[in-house]
């Protein structure tokens, strides 16, 4: 990773630029199915963490970009209750309370595929449900609506991802946390079990913390 951030004969990249460079590498590796043996996609997720280790004090813009990249990668490491998607059907990601992340995710996923499926980003507003979603990202701005949105995602068989101190407590499967100014994520296997979701062991190996389930 240091070779990427500071190649011989070039000036070292600034923290935000370093993260953007790492994102290009991480996103270049297409997400793979959970049961496949190819490790390149997960190496891309590891690259996000490694880049943040290099880039001290990343800006809010870089934080947003890293979260969007993780959301994109998560899709390839989850078995959903409905089974594999039909040919031509897209993965649908809902975003509530985080317009900036929605815009960044739409930009990053444009023209990219997950398991040969396109990714559609849907901005959720008050009163919108989670039906038809595969992943629901609930931004911190949702506040008191967080628990209700997590419950809606669970009922729809969608992966819930939050970014608050109460995310896991509210029932979210994945929750973003900042550790030493770096974006990491924690996982609740119990919440995944309640939502009938199966998470790849490779995804769990990159998590900052994993809360075990009942099984």
Regions found by a protein language model. Give the residues of each.
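Short hydrophobic alpha-helices and adjacent helix-cap/hinge residues
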Residues: 2-215
């Amino acid at each position: 990773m240091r070779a990427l951030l500071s190649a011989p004969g070039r000036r070292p990249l600034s923290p935000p630029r370093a993260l953007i460079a790492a994102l290009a590498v991480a996103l270049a590796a297409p997400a793979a199915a959970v049961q496949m043996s190819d490790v390149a996609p997960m190496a891309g997720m590891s690259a996000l963490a490694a880049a943040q280790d290099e880039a001290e004090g990343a800006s809010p813009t870089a934080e947003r970009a890293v979260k969007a990249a993780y959301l994109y990668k998560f899709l390839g490491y989850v078995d959903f209750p409905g089974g594999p998607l039909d040919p031509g059907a897209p993965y649908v990601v809902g975003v509530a309370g985080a317009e900036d992340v929605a815009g960044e995710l739409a930009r990053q996923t444009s023209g990219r595929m997950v398991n040969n499926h396109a990714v559609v980003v849907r901005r959720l507003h008050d009163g919108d449900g989670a039906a038809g979603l595969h992943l629901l990202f609930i931004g911190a701005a949702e506040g008191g609506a967080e628990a209700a949105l997590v419950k809606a995602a669970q009922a729809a068989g969608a992966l819930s991802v939050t970014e608050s101190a109460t995310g896991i407590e509210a029932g979210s499967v994945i929750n973003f946390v900042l550790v030493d100014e770096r974006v990491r994520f924690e996982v609740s296997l119990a919440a995944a079990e309640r939502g009938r979701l199966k998470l790849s062991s490779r995804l769990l190996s990159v998590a900052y913390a994993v809360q075990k389930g009942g099984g």
